[in-house]
């Protein structure tokens, strides 16, 4: 048992020895590897220090190489413009021909692009080349401008606007095929204008050329309409009737100018771009609008000298021009300010005319040298009322003017009146009715004063004023618009005050006659010392018997005086000129006053005459018939 155990230990011991031997070899190998690593690290550091400068030099060389490539490319780009000059110069100097316009425009674009490249480098060495290119571009631009004038000039023969207006035809414009040629020419001129020195408005000679050619075409075509507008005024020099709406040529002139602008705008939109469109329209139409403004100023001068009859033309001009300015701005976005500036003097005249219309009405009434002795009305009434009826046809412009003035401020042209604070939310219809009412009251008050000065009798004054009121009332009733504006209770009451005063003035002439029929002093002398009972039958015999001889004589004198006064007033009444309505109204008023008084007086005292007619010329029936005959 001992021997096998020793053998096992011996084998294990041998294996341990082998392991120790291997471990020793591993240690030696590890030391060798460590030594190799140290040597390798040392060698790596040596290599690193050797290669570092080489790598840096390589990077520098790469940067230098890239810079050289860029310089070469820049040189190539610098050579290209010079090549373009050589390539395009011949085409440009030869000028545009009918069959080579696209090539010519392409040559201009090439030179323009080359010039832009040269100027972008900012090199002093390029200054000579830039100068040469600029000169060449200027030559080409000049030739294009000549061509533009030529092509635009082919379509500027003046036209007759009335032909197109009366037949409702569109106004002619530049043909589409011509626009297709002109548009790129203008674009080339605009591009070249950046580099080529030029004069003119809008930043481009193309705009000025277009305006210089097309502007006179519009002005010349519309010239006859301007003359016609002024000639229609000359025919009104001796006409004292109010201006009739639409009879002046300014409306047709405005329509024509509007259509010219629209036609021009359609062409401009296709030729120019951006802000150049608005500038082109303004420059092109400026001369035509200036002539239009001049015409309006001349019309305004005439209006100011004939305000009472021709202020309506001012209102019409305001209505027309204001509407045109907004319509044109809506379609083109331009020209509104030019139209409103042209309108300014007329608008000021229109404001002034409202106060002047009141003053002129008053002055004309006060200046009447004499009135018809038969009480007939003055023609001034018809003239003023026709003017007011005409005024209702201009509600839109008047609403603007009255609102800007403020309620009542039309009564004075003074600065203090014009500066009165305005109602922030005025009713234009109310303002209009107040103004019309002011004119009517001014007329009636002035004629009342004049009637008191020129008519010696109350009867003549009353008839005259009643006739005046009748004409005013008739004019109001005949005009639906005038009736609408003066239909408020306040307006009716204010106007009716004059009717009542006129009637009262006429009845004053009959007061003396009616006084003969008043016998208050005799009623106290009845028997028994008491007043007679009112109502019931009157016993004339008893009353007459109760009178003393003196009282009877006084009553007889009253009958005689009444008869004479009544006959005189009846004759005068029939001799007066009265409007149909006036004669009827005044007769009824007289009858309402005299008939009951006479009936009472006759019933009481007719027995004095005993039916002989010596004192009682009229019985109740004959007096009533006589009064009825006054109508």
From Swiss-Prot:
Where in this chain does the entry annotate a coiled-coil region?
Answer: none
What is an example of a GO molecular function annotated in this UniProt entry? phosphatidylinositol-4,5-bisphosphate binding
* Assigned keywords, A-Z: Exocytosis, Protein transport, Transport
Q: Name one GO biological process term.
A: exocytosis
Q: What is this protein called?
A: Exocyst complex protein exo70
Which positions, given as ranges, span the membrane? none
Family per UniProt? Belongs to the EXO70 family.
Describe the function of this protein.
Involved in the secretory pathway as part of the exocyst complex which tethers secretory vesicles to the sites of exocytosis. Also plays a role in the assembly of the exocyst.
Q: Provide one Gene Ontology cellular component.
A: exocyst
Q: Where in the cell is it found?
A: Bud; Bud neck
List the lineage, top down: Eukaryota, Fungi, Dikarya, Ascomycota, Pezizomycotina
Q: Which PANTHER family match?
A: EXOCYST COMPLEX COMPONENT 7 (PTHR12542:SF41), EXOCYST COMPLEX PROTEIN EXO70 (PTHR12542)
